[in-house]
């Protein structure tokens, strides 16, 4: 489960219409969410609040063995008025990373397009999509030696975003050296067809570049940009990218490349369209899935992942890694299972009332709410008038060494609780290798 501040940052990105999926950094996000999730450490309590639409605070306290904590503040020039901030109202799927459904890339809206549009086509949301919005975030970790993390995020243009991350650690009392500090600058450019990221870090003067290219029609052309919005022609997306790092001070070089093939929402809707007069002719399975292949030539590491969304509440993922130099391999498998609770709609009667359908025909009862639009997120409404909401999720992962992680995240009253355990073989002893607990933790979040 992500922190409250991370949730606000994701909301800021969505409000400014920044596509987080069109980046080489997010190439393996789905597999990482299903296989590389972490369990809470010890007992941690998070108290958060979105006091105003532009200001948020978070206080964190960790206990059991070692007492530590942090204080976080966030300010946004863009008011997040419609953002659910209470822990009882925040959708659980917004806080728990899982299978990510990739959508067709769209070209960012430019100011010229908004100016030449008709007056009735102009909306405040469209104008805010290219405004130079800014977000400031700072976190102070306690106790001493304290660490200060800061983030400055600004939308420079419809296709460009600037990010400055600062990390400063207080020096020990006996040390006469200056406090350790580093600044990471990242300039991101996204056109829909491709994305590029330029990085510079003051730590060893590290320079970096990341790029991602999407095969298929160019969304920047007006003729092709409207197709995904109307007919949803594309059912799959193939992306290729890479990254490179170099430090002139330490002579460190890093290089990696990767591919991603994923189904788009149109592939999942082929089942519904097949019953119409124009059946779908898509050879792709209706189950959403994502395939990735990453290669690090310098270290000889090769990794492949396969993630499948078997149902709206069940997802599977697997990863196989191999090193051509050391002949070492890695196999990891994981899954997540969502549990939904059913709430009776106010306009429906109990199951014992068999005449409710007749009363609706006569106008004695209000009609049932319409079925939801395809592609809705966590909550849905059944034809019987029952509203389904995500209540909890269970995540499980296991590797070839029988290291097991089990995580449960859900809502308990007004609290968001995350509890996990880790099992695995311990260090070899005289009696042989033993199998036991490797970690246990509980995290509690309450926000207003």
Swiss-Prot record:
Any GO BP annotation: establishment of mitochondrion localization
Give the InterPro entries listed for this entry: Mdm10
A Pfam family assignment: MDM10
Main location per the UniProt record: mitochondrion
Localization, per the record, is: Mitochondrion outer membrane
Ordered alphabetically, the record's keywords are: Membrane, Mitochondrion, Mitochondrion outer membrane, Transmembrane, Transmembrane beta strand
Please provide, in alphabetical order, the Gene Ontology terms of the cellular component aspect for this entry.
ERMES complex; SAM complex
The answer to whether UniProt assigns keyword tRNA-binding to this entry is: no
Cystine bridges: none
The segments labelled Disordered in the record are 101-126, 366-386
The record gives the membrane topology as: Multi-pass membrane protein
Presence of the UniProt keyword Lyase in the record? no
Locations of Basic and acidic residues compositional bias? 112-126
Superkingdom is: Eukaryota
* Self-association state and partner proteins as the record states: Component of the ER-mitochondria encounter structure (ERMES) or MDM complex, composed of MMM1, MDM10, MDM12 and MDM34. Associates with the mitochondrial outer membrane sorting assembly machinery SAM(core) complex.
Q: Which family does it belong to?
A: Belongs to the MDM10 family.
Q: What is known of its domains?
A: Lacks alpha-helical transmembrane segments, suggesting that it resides in the membrane via beta-sheet conformations similar to those predicted for other outer membrane proteins and porin.
Function text: Component of the ERMES/MDM complex, which serves as a molecular tether to connect the endoplasmic reticulum and mitochondria. Components of this complex are involved in the control of mitochondrial shape and protein biogenesis and may function in phospholipid exchange. MDM10 is involved in the late assembly steps of the general translocase of the mitochondrial outer membrane (TOM complex). Functions in the TOM40-specific route of the assembly of outer membrane beta-barrel proteins, including the association of TOM40 with the receptor TOM22 and small TOM proteins.
Name the record gives this protein: Mitochondrial distribution and morphology protein 10
Q: Which organism is it from?
A: Coccidioides immitis (strain RS) (Valley fever fungus)
């Amino acid at each position: 489960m992500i922190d409250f501040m991370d949730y606000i940052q994701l909301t800021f990105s969505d409000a400014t219409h920044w596509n987080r999926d069109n980046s080489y950094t997010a190439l393996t996000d789905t597999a990482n969410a299903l296989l590389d999730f972490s369990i809470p450490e010890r007992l941690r309590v998070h108290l958060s609040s979105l006091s105003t639409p532009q200001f948020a605070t978070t206080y964190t306290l960790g206990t059991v063995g070692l007492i530590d904590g942090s204080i976080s503040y966030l300010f946004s020039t863009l008011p997040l008025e419609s953002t659910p901030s209470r822990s009882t109202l925040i959708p659980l799927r917004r806080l728990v990373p899982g299978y990510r459904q990739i959508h067709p890339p769209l070209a960012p809206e430019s100011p010229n397009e908004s100016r030449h549009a008709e007056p009735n086509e102009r909306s405040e949301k469209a104008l805010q999509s290219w405004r130079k919005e800014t977000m400031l975030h700072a976190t102070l970790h306690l106790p001493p030696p304290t660490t200060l993390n800061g983030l400055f995020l600004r939308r420079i243009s419809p296709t460009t975003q600037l990010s400055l991350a600062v990390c400063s650690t207080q020096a020990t009392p006996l040390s006469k050296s200056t406090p350790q500090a580093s600044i990471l600058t990242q300039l991101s450019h996204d056109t829909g067809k491709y994305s590029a990221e330029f990085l510079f870090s003051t730590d060893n003067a590290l320079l970096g570049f990341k790029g991602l290219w999407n095969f298929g029609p160019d969304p920047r052309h007006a003729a092709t940009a409207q197709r995904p919005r109307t007919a949803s022609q594309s059912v799959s997306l193939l992306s290729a990218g890479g990254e490179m790092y170099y430090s002139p001070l330490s002579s460190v070089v890093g290089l990696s490349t990767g591919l991603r093939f994923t189904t788009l929402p149109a592939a999942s809707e082929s089942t519904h369209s097949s019953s119409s007069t124009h059946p779908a002719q898509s050879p792709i399975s209706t189950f959403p899935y994502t395939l990735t292949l990453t290669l690090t030539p310098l270290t000889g590491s090769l990794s492949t992942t396969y993630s499948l969304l078997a149902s709206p509440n069940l997802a599977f993922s697997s990863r196989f890694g191999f090193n051509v130099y050391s002949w070492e391999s890695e196999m990891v498998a994981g899954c997540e299972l969502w549990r939904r609770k059913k709430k009776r709609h106010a306009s429906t009667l109990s199951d014992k009332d068999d005449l409710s359908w007749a009363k609706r025909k006569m106008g004695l009862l209000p009609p049932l709410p319409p079925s939801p639009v395809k592609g809705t997120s966590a909550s849905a409404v059944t034809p019987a008038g029952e509203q389904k909401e995500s209540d909890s999720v269970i995540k499980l992962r296991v590797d070839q060494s029988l290291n097991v992680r089990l995580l449960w995240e859900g809502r308990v009253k007004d609290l968001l609780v995350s509890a996990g355990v880790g099992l695995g073989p311990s260090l070899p002893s005289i009696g042989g290798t033993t199998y036991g607990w490797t970690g246990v933790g509980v995290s509690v979040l309450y926000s207003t």
